[in-house]
């Protein structure tokens, strides 16, 4: 086996940066360490430091740190240190002591050794090294390929490879979640993941070249090239990171069936678009701007009309402009190359650069404020021209759209003015929108290019998203990011600890399941649930006047004090203001909500968007083509989601994308990578403790440790534990005796002095609490030290003894050598010895010569043989080479064929498996889709219903507002409503009758629906979910109703306030009326003068209108002239340019002529002609220039003259305009006041009408319930009478049943023997339990599924046992039949038995086949776990278990044979059988539990054999049948047993009911009646089954099984129906009493309402009569006024013109009375008018003198006129009398008008008081009804609880599914009818509203006529006064003339 260092050699130069060497590990383990005194201690500056405990006193610990400090801290501030062997451990979850300082220092020490990757349980934590490390080299990629996680050091490649291998083996999508703060290395790790997949799964196929011939690459190149492009447009420099990703992304890499790359796509989230227009001082904008300006591609500078200096552009120069670590020029080339590789067309590429340049130009757009206005106007057009050119727009249209956007008001568009700041904000928003949409569009295009249309099998998703952020200033973006991390942490907790706890469950450890994912639920719900932060934010965005303050107030009202996660922040000095705090899992974050509403709405200038949509740049038009009709998806989703006409807020879009992301992640197997930034200064190797701890908390690493400590984080396999810790007590495990590892571990731990509550034994592992394993390690180290010390002593002793023996042997050898040397020295001079020395060599030489001769001969022979063999060898080698070549060729062919065959087989197997899986998935998805479609349809209908109800409620509110203002108009509408309600109640009665019939029909069709039980149960679950959702929606609506009630109370208070204001207004109006009268007297003197000036004013107004029209025409003409001037200028510029070109050409030609010298005469003539043409063109150009200048001068002069004239006219009209505007503003104020009053009153009225309608609906519902209850009571009475008649018969049957039950006691012995046998089998099954443990572990998923099936089967078994009692009666009835038919059926039973035996044999064969298949599956799983041998043992044990099952079945046969013999003895002993049956039931329950435990271990065999298991269960049940077959006997036995217990209960109920009350007797009789009908039906069905048995035995078994199931269901259904009827009866009785009480109260309320309406009608009639009187009086006044006017016209025809002027002046007078405050300004104008009028008076006096002259000329005719004068005097006297009479009449009329006013006010007050009283009565009644409704709701809630309980029971079986579905349809019909009802109510309300509007218009018309009559009376009075004066003057003149 290779050493660890040798294994690490495969990593090359990266090995030291990945894992410690073996030498370092040994040195670490040998470090001196004291586990009791070595600790971590809390330090004020460095968070934690290492130290040594000096002393402990009174809860305080004194620690000496490594730096020499001595600290005294509390005990809980000291943390134990891990042993040295855990130093730089690769997986921190394996540490003995899990706490913050241990994690921190492990990361720190590994980081100091440049090991930047560390595991922490499921996490991989990586620390940014801030330097290049050779850990991503190609050899590292290859070294990690195919390695398991524990086989290789921690690395991002290991995570990637594990995900890849899991995808291939588990056939499941994978995801890698990479999170961390900015600068922690998320993007780098993401790129490394993509690099790894692109390397190991490269398809190697070139993409097809497109026709355009643009640059293409492989799919791997394109995936890798997507990063530079996205980084250029989505990355920027921040304070912490020079290349920070300012967006999140989820990259999905799709693989084919063989694991090769198939395609990829990208989704992006939360692009920081605000960086486009603003950067902090130490940051800069996105890289692409600076890459373009790097001048690497000068053609871009020219194309984009920009410079190379970033400071020329405001948007990109607010921070830094260069980054030392980034070469913008190289990055530009990489970006440009990536665009080409990714397949963007040339036009698209140009559009990308142009739009980027346009964004830069946008930042330089300047605007200024117009003089004397707030309107913005462009300050120069050069920048706008550049931006418009790049965007394909018209510059003038762009500036106009920015300064004068068009806004839609109603159905019309209105031009709106913008201030400078508004325009700048609009430009910034547009720049950000263009950049963001372009970025998202590029992602879509990248996805289209990466979609190769190759078949996809699975994908691996890589999530690179910002980590948790806690800044000094946290805004909306931080909330979104933190919320995302909150959801991801919840996902991690759920995933990690669900797996952890599932392992506890799998290992059989007692553990209460804890959902750690719920730890974060409170914070998540606070943010995203209804009425959460996002919900309130979106709601505020819908209100036009909402502000940040109102948003904050709503947050406080909704959550402050109600949620622990929502807090009010404490103000801190030196920090930004915070408005609220949220308690996240990573800490408490203070948020500032400034500008959240605008950020969430993200408004854009729609006028500019319209220009974008018409842009000549197709890409820009495409970006905004669907603006307003499409919600933008995040990132790379193809297409978008329609959202209709409504806008989608940023928060809603963010939540939608987040939900999609979480759905994607939940469908995958996740892997987690947490990136850590070690320090703020980007210093390699340095680590700041507090910063790292903060990130560990934010990333959830410490949270994971916290939760991990609650469980058993350390676990060891039994074999490993036994081997490692046996040394602690070797005597507990004796040598030479085999002991199971689990038992050995239990004995070993039991013999050690440790806390035995700190560990648990699983099936395969022993689990330890945190810290206990470290204690065992310490004990093991101590024991090993002791053992090693003894071993060293023994070894040293043994070595010394060996050394001693060696020394003794050396001594003896030395003695021997010395002896021999001494002897030789003594004999070496002896002569004979010398002779021996001489002769001895000679003897050897003679022999050697002979040997040499022989050897030469042999050498020659051998040489010849060698030559021959060499020749043969060469021939053979040549042949061998040829054969080897042929062999290799054949082997290659065979290998190729084998590989291709294996690949084909593998692909075939994979395709078959894939097909099966896909078919199953398709089936599941289809079923789920159908269910979801049904749910969606139901939810959509419910949603529409709720929306309709909401809209109708709003409309009802509006209707009620009008109704409250005119309460007296409601009588007719109420009568119509009552009639409609009566009709609808009749319709509902008919509907209820129909529904009752349908219910009966459904009960009759009940048997047919039983076969669909399983499908319908699923539907019930979905319906229940839908119901819960609807209940939640109802709760939300109830909450909104409470808010509406609060709003109503506020409106009531506002109404009372407005009523007080109205009274004050009335008082002020009376004062104004008095002032008016006084002013009338003053103004009458000026009437004549005003009448003349008024005509002039009208003429001036007409002239002003004409001048305004003329001004507009002139302005239009000016614009046209300006356009013409501009055109002339352009043409002039062109002409100038053309002239310059011609002159330049002329000069060039002249130069050429001079150079040519010897030109011919023809050339000279041509030159002269050209010169003449040039001269002519110059003259034409000069003439055109002069003409243009003359035209321009004339136009300027004309424009100046018209401007001067218009200026004078405008000044004249301006004064008139100001006057009219003042009048208009005051009228608007009055109209607003009246509208607000009307609105408040109408709202209150709407609330009342709404309550009335709800009460009427409740009344109708109560009436229908009452009638239904009455019908049920009648039915129950009839049933009661019938049951009483049958009581006697059932009493007799009960006595028979008593005798029958007494016989059952004899079966006790048989049952007890059966129980003993089953217990014996149970013991055998328990013995097989351990053998099947490993098999169960590998098939745990299948076990879960089959366990659910088994539980269902056990429930069915329980139901069969309950049905046993029913079969007892059948046995009694069939006994006679069996006695008569026994002989005939014997043969049939024998045949059936043979067939059953054959089926049993087939089943056994099927079992064996399934066992073989299970074995193969087990081998596959165990091969992955290196446990093939264990699996074989498990399979054998499983076969043994099957044999045990067969044996068990035979025992059942024996038991049933005994039952046949003893069945006749079970008909006696009633009293004893009751007690014994109870004990028997408890024993059976225990047996059932034990049997369940045994069968839990056999469920692996049932996974592929569901049908077989069902057949075996059927056989087991069929064996119990007495006479027909073994299977029937088993069923009959269970039937009899269950029937016995149920009949006992029935008899007990019967006896109790006979002794106590008649009600219980009725229930018993109902139950017995149902049982009787069920038994009769079962007898008939059994007869049919017997007939079928004669025809086809196999079909009989199946039909009997189905029939038995039907009987069980029907019997349970009958019991349930009985209980349901009882519960319904009780509820209906309660509801009947409440309904009666409510009906009486409703009738009383109706009578009160009708009385109130009568009073209101009386008031209305009085008001109408008053109005008729006023009309008559007004008509009389009109007639008199007309007479007076006619007389005045007869007397003075010349005053007609004055009369017309007078009317106009009177109108002005009325306006003046309404504007008392403006009279002072008008008086000044009247003084000026007076001067003009004095001149007019002079003219009138001259005319008067002319008239006197005419009178003097008539003196000659005086005598003739004396009589006429006398007559005229008499007529004058009459006229004076008439005038006096009219004066009196006028006064009387004035008094009458005043009285009418008073009466009208009184009538209005009475109406208001009556309305108030009525309102108060209605409010009191409403409160009473609300109280009753609350009580009714409480009672209904209790009823609903009963209904829910009933529904839960119904879910278990069949009937209610169909009934619920029909109920839903019925409710839908009822909803439709109710909607029609609501619509009819709405129509009635509209009719009432129209009637009230007609009456209101009549009243206003009458009031207006009255005012006109008053005006005419005043006019008549003034005319009479004038006539009086003139008549006096004439009379005086006549008297003077007579005198």
UniProtKB/Swiss-Prot annotation:
* Signal peptide segment: none
Q: What does this protein do?
A: Muscle contraction. Myosin is a protein that binds to F-actin and has ATPase activity that is activated by F-actin.
Tell me the segments the record calls region Hinge. 839-841
Quaternary structure and partners: Muscle myosin is a hexameric protein that consists of 2 heavy chain subunits (MHC), 2 alkali light chain subunits (MLC) and 2 regulatory light chain subunits (MLC-2).
Query: Could you confirm whether the keyword Phosphoprotein appears in this record?
Result: yes
Belongs to which family?
A: Belongs to the TRAFAC class myosin-kinesin ATPase superfamily. Myosin family.
Q: Which Gene3D superfamilies match?
A: 1.10.10.820, 1.20.5.340, 1.20.5.370, 1.20.5.4820, 1.20.58.530, 6.10.250.2420, Kinesin motor domain, Myosin S1 fragment, N-terminal
List keywords of the entry alphabetically. Acetylation, Actin-binding, ATP-binding, Calmodulin-binding, Coiled coil, Cytoplasm, Methylation, Motor protein, Muscle protein, Myosin, Nucleotide-binding, Phosphoprotein, Thick filament
Instruction: State whether keyword Thylakoid applies.
Output: no
Coiled-coil stretches:
842-1939
GO:BP terms for this protein? muscle contraction
One example of the protein's molecular function in GO is:
actin filament binding
Residue ranges constituting the Myosin motor domain according to the UniProt record: 87-781
Residue ranges of every copy of the Myosin N-terminal SH3-like domain listed in the record: 34-83
Q: Which residues are recorded as modified (N6-methyllysine)? A: 36
Q: What is the lineage of its organism?
A: Eukaryota, Metazoa, Chordata, Craniata, Vertebrata
Q: Name one GO cellular component term.
A: myosin II complex
- Record PTM N-acetylalanine, positions in chain: 2
Recorded domain comment: The rodlike tail sequence is highly repetitive, showing cycles of a 28-residue repeat pattern composed of 4 heptapeptides, characteristic for alpha-helical coiled coils. Limited proteolysis of myosin heavy chain produces 1 light meromyosin (LMM) and 1 heavy meromyosin (HMM). HMM can be further cleaved into 2 globular subfragments (S1) and 1 rod-shaped subfragment (S2).
Q: In which residues is ATP bound?
A: 180-187
Q: What is this protein called?
A: Myosin heavy chain, skeletal muscle, adult
Ranges that cross the membrane = none
Where is the IQ domain positioned along the sequence? Answer: 784-813
Could you tell me which residues belong to the region Actin-binding?
658-680, 760-774
Q: What CDD domains does the entry give? A: MYSc_class_II (cd01377)
Where it sits in the cell: the answer is: Cytoplasm, Myofibril
């Amino acid at each position: 086996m290779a050493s660890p260092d040798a294994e690490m050699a495969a990593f090359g130069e990266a090995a030291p940066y990945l894992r410690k060497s073996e030498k370092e590990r040994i040195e670490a383990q040998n470090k001196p360490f004291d586990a009791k005194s070595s600790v971590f201690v809390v330090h004020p500056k460095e968070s934690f430091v290492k130290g040594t405990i000096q002393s402990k006193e009174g809860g305080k610990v004194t620690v000496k740190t490594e730096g020499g400090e001595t600290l005294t801290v509390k005990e809980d501030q000291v943390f134990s240190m891990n042993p040295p062997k855990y130093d730089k451990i690769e997986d921190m979850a394996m540490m003995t002591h899990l706490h913050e300082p241990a994690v921190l220092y492990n990361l720190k020490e590994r980081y100091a050794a440049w090991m930047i990757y560390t595991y922490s349980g499921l996490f991989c934590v990586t620390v940014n090294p801030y330097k290049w490390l050779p850990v991503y080299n190609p050899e590292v990629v290859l070294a990690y390929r195919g390695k398991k996680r524990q086989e290789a050091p921690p690395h991002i490649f290991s995570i990637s490879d594990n995900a890849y291998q899991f995808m291939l083996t588990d056939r499941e999508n994978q995801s890698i979640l990479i999170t961390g703060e900015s600068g922690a290395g998320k993007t780098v790790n993401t790129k490394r993941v993509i690099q790894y997949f692109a390397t190991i799964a490269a398809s190697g196929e070139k993409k097809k070249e497109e026709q355009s011939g643009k640059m293409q690459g492989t799919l791997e190149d394109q995936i890798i090239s997507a990063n530079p492009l996205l980084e250029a447009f989505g990355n920027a420099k921040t304070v912490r990171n020079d290349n920070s990703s300012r967006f999140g992304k989820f990259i999905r890499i799709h693989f084919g069936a063989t694991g090769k790359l198939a395609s990829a796509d990208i989704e992006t989230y939360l692009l920081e678009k605000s960086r486009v227009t603003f950067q902090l001082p130490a940051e800069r904008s996105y890289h692409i701007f600076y890459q373009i300006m790097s001048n690497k591609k000068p053609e871009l500078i020219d194309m984009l009309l920009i410079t190379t200096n970033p400071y020329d552009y405001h948007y990109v120069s607010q921070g830094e402009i260069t980054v030392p670590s980034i070469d913008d020029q190289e990055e530009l080339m990489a970006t440009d190359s990536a665009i080409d590789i990714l397949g963007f067309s040339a036009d698209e590429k140009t559009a990308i650069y142009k739009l980027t340049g346009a964004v830069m130009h946008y930042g330089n757009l300047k605007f200024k404020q117009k003089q004397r206005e707030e309107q913005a106007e462009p300050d120069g057009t050069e920048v706008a021209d550049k931006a418009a050119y790049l965007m394909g727009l018209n510059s003038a249209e762009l500036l106009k759209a920015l300064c004068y956007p068009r806004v839609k008001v109603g159905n019309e568009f209105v031009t709106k003015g913008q201030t400078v700041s508004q325009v700048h904000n609009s430009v910034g928003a547009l720049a950000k929108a263009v950049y963001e949409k372009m970025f998202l569009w590029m992602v879509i295009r990248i996805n289209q290019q990466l979609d190769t249309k190759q078949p996809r099998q699975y994908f691996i998703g890589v999530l690179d998203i910002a980590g948790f952020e806690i800044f000094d200033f946290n805004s909306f973006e931080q909330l979104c990011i933190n919320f995302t991390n909150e959801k991801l942490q919840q996902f991690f907790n759920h995933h990690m600890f669900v797996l952890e706890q599932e392992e506890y469950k799998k290992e059989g450890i007692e553990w209460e399941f804890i959902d750690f994912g719920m730890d974060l639920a409170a914070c998540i719900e606070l943010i995203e649930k209804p009425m959460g932060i996002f919900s309130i934010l979106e709601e505020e965005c819908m209100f036009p006047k909402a502000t940040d303050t109102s948003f904050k107030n709503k947050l406080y009202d909704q959550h402050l004090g109600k949620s622990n996660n929502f807090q009010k922040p404490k103000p801190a000095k030196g920090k930004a203001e915070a408005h609220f705090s949220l308690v996240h899992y990573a800490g408490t974050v203070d948020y500032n909500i400034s500008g959240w509403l605008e950020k969430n709405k993200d408004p854009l200038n729609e006028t500019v968007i319209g220009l974008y949509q018409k842009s000549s740049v197709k890409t820009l038009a495409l970006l905004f083509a669907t603006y307003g009709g499409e919600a933008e998806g995040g990132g790379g989703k193809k297409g978008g989601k329609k959202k209709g006409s409504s806008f989608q807020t940023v928060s809603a879009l963010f939540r939608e994308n987040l939900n999609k992301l979480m759905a994607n992640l939940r469908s995958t197997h996740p892997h987690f990578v947490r990136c850590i930034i070690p320090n703020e200064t980007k210093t390699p190797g340095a680590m700041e403790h507090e910063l790292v701890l903060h990130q560990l908390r934010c990333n959830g690493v410490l949270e994971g440790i916290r939760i991990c400590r609650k469980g058993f984080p350390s676990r060891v396999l039994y074999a490993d534990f036994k081997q490692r810790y046996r040394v602690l007590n070797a005597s507990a495990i004796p040598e030479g005796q085999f002991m199971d590892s689990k038992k050995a571990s239990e004995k070993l731990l039991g013999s050690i002095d440790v806390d035995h509550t700190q560990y648990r034994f699983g099936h395969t592992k022993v689990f330890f609490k945190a810290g206990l394993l470290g204690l065992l390690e310490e004990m093991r180290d101590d024991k090993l030290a002791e053992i090693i010390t003894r071993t060293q002593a023994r070894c040293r002793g043994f070595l010394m003894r060996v050394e001693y023996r060696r020394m003794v042997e050396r001594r003896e050898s030395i003695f021997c050598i010395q002896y021999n040397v001494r002897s030789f020295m003594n004999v070496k001079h002896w002569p004979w010895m010398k002779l021996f020395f001489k002769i001895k060599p000679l003897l050897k030489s003679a022999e050697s010569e002979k040997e040499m001769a022989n050897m030469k001969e042999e050498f020659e022979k051998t040489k010849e043989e060698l030559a021959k063999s060499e020749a043969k060898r060469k021939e053979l080698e040549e042949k061998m080479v040829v054969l080897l070549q042929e062999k290799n060729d054949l082997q290659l062919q065979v290998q190729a064929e084998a590989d291709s065959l294996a690949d084909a087989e593998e692909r075939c197997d994979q395709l078959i498996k894939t097909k099966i899986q896909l078919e199953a998935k398709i089936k599941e998805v289809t079923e789920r889709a159908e269910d979801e479609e049904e749910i969606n349809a139901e939810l959509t209908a419910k949603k529409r219903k709720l929306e309709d109800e909401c809209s109708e409620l709003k409309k009802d509110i509006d209707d009620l507002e009008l109704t409250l203002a005119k309460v007296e108009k409601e009588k007719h509408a109420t009568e119509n409503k009552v009639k409609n309600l009566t009709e609808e109640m009749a319709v509902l009665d008919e509907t209820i009758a129909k529904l009752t019939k349908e219910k009966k029909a459904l009960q009759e069709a009940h048997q047919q629906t039983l076969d669909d039980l399983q499908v319908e149960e699923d539907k019930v679950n979905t319906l229940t979910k839908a119901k819960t959702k609807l209940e939640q929606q109802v709760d939300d609506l109830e909450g909104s109703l409470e808010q509406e009630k609060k709003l109503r109370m506020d409106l009531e208070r506002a109404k009372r306030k407005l009523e007080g204001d109205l009274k004050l207004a009335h008082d002020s109006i009376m004062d104004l009326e008095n002032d008016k009268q006084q002013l009338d007297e003053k103004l009458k003197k000026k009437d004549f003068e005003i009448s003349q000036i008024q005509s002039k004013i009208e003429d001036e107004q007409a002239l002003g209108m004409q001048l305004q029209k003329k001004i507009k025409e002139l302005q239009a003409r000016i614009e046209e002239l300006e356009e013409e001037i501009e055109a002339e200028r352009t043409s002039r510029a062109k002409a100038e340019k053309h002239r310059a070109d011609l002159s330049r050409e002329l000069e060039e030609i002249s130069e050429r002529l001079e150079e040519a010298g010897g030109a011919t005469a023809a050339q000279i003539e041509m030159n002269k002609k050209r010169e003449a043409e040039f001269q002519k063109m110059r003259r034409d150009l000069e003439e055109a220039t002069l003409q243009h200048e003359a035209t321009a001068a004339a136009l300027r002069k004309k424009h100046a003259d018209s401007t001067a004239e218009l200026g004078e006219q405008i000044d004249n009209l301006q004064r008139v305009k100001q006057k009219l505007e003042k009048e208009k503003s005051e009228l608007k104020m009055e109209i607003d006041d009246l509208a607000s009053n009307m609105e408040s009153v109408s709202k209150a009225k709407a609330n009342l009408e709404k309550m009335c309608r709800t009460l009427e609906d409740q009344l109708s519902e109560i009436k229908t319930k009452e009638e239904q209850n009455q019908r049920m009571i009648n039915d129950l009475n009839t049933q009661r009478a019938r049951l009483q008649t049958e009581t006697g018969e059932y009493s007799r049957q009960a006595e028979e049943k008593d005798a029958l039950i007494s016989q059952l006691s004899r079966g006790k012995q048989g049952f007890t023997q059966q129980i003993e046998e089953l217990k014996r089998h149970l013991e055998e099954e328990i013995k097989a339990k351990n053998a099947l443990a490993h098999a169960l572990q590998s098939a745990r998923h299948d076990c879960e599924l089959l366990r659910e099936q088994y539980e269902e089967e056990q429930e069915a078994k329980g139901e069969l046992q309950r049905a046993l009692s029913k079969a007892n009666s059948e046995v009694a009835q069939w006994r006679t039949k069996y006695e008569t038919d026994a002989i005939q059926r014997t043969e049939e039973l024998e045949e059936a038995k043979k067939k059953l035996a054959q089926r049993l044999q087939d089943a056994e064969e099927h079992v064996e086949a399934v066992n073989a298949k299970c074995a193969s599956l087990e081998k596959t799983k165990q091969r992955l776990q290196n446990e093939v041998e264990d699996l074989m043992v498990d399979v054998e044990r499983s076969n043994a278990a099957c044999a045990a099952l067969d044996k068990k079945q035979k025992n059942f046969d024996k038991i049933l044979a005994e039952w046949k013999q003893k069945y006749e003895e079970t008909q006696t002993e009633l009293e004893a059988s009751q007690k014994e049956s109870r004990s028997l039931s408890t024993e059976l329950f225990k047996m059932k539990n034990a049997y369940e435990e045994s069968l839990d271990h056999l469920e692996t065999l049932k996974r592929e054999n569901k049908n077989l298991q069902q057949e075996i269960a059927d056989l087991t049940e069929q064996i119990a049948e007495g006479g027909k077959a073994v299977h029937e006997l088993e069923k009959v036995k269970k039937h009899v047993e269950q029937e016995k217990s149920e009949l006992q209960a029935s008899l007990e109920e019967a006896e109790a009911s006979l002794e106590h009350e008649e009600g219980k007797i009725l229930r018993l009789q109902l139950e017995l009646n149902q049982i009787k009908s069920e038994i009769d039906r079962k007898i008939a069905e059994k007869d049919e089954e017997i007939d079928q048995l004669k025809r086809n035995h196999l079909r009989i078994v199946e039909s009997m099984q189905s029939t038995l199931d039907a009987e069980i269901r029907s019997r349970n259904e009958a019991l349930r129906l009985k209980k349901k009827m009882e519960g319904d009866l009780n509820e209906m009785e309660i509801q009947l009493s409440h309904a009666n009480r409510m009906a009486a109260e409703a009738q009383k309320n109706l009578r009160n309402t009708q009385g109130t309406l009568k009073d209101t009608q009386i008031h209305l009639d009085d008001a109408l009569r008053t109005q008729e009187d006023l009309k008559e009086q007004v008509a009389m006044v009109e007639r008199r006024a007309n007479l007076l006017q006619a007389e005045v016209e007869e007397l003075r025809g010349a005053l007609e013109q004055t009369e017309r002027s007078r009317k106009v002046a009177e109108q002005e007078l009325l306006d003046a009375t309404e504007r008392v405050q403006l009279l002072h300004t008008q008086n000044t104008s009247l003084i000026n008018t007076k001067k003009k009028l004095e001149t007019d008076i002079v003219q009138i006096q001259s005319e008067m003198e002319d008239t006197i002259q005419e009178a003097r000329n008539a003196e000659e005719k005086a005598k003739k006129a004396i009589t006429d004068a006398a007559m005229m005097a008499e007529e004058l006297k009459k006229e004076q009398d008439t005038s006096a009479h009219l004066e009196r009449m006028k006064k009387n009329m004035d008094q009458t008008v005043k009285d009418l006013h008073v009466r009208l006010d009184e009538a209005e007050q009475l109406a208001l008081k009556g309305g108030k009283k009525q309102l108060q009565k209605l409010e009191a009644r409403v409160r009473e009804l609300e109280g009753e409704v609350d009580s009714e709701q409480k009672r209904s809630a209790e009823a609903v609880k009963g209904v829910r309980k009933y529904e839960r029971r119904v879910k278990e079986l069949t009937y209610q599914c169909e009934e619920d579905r029909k109920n839903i349809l019925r409710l839908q019909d009822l909803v439709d009818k109710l909607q029609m009802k609501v619509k009819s109510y709405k129509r009635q309300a509209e009719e009432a509203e129209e009637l009230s509007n007609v009456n209101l218009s009549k009243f206003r018309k009458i009031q207006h006529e009255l005012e006109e009559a008053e005006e005419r009376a005043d006019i008549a009075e003034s005319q009479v006064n004038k006539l009086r004066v003139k008549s006096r003057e004439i009379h005086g003149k006549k008297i003077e003339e007579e005198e």
